[in-house]
Amino acid sequence: NLPESSFPVNANSAVRISTKVSEPEDFFPVAEFRKQSAILIGCQNQIHLMPKLYGDIAKAIGNRVPLFGVVGSETQALRGAELIRSIGLPPHAMRFLVIPSNSIWIRDYAPFILRYDDDRALMVDAKYHTRRMREDRKQDDFMGFELARSLGLTVRSIPLVLEGGNFISNGDGLLLTSSKTLSVNKEGHFTHKQLITMFN
């Protein structure tokens, strides 16, 4: 008998590879203080309510890195483009992605974008929910798939509840989080030992 992880998989096969222990890969979350390839911010209807804030962000970044604003409709995207034009910046100073969402808290529900050593990227999309939601925030939960499709990136789903605002990476293998990450995932029927194993 071959170990489970040795079974071949092809497009015509219903067999899936299952590994007992996850194998390390060479990707890592980029540290926030390192040079970024792009910046993604939630705008939604706030682009209309607080235009000066978004204009100031675009000016401060000054085309040093691509800036993307996530909006929920074409109307919001057009308002954003008009804002950028009205403050004298070129159209590419801030581009707008139309991706439906339920809230502005994009740092919490956006996927983690990881970089391989050879500069390829992929997205890791965790579960996302608040204390009282699943239905109320369904668009937020699926935002990662829409973003991956828009940018043409691979996306991997993981069965953990992770909020991006609850993580920070040093970009070199150290990822810090709070005890909240463990407690919400224990509610999802993971044991403490399973969670510690996943994070080590």
Region roles according to the model:
Residues 2-200:
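The feature marks the mature, well-folded catalytic cores of soluble enzymes
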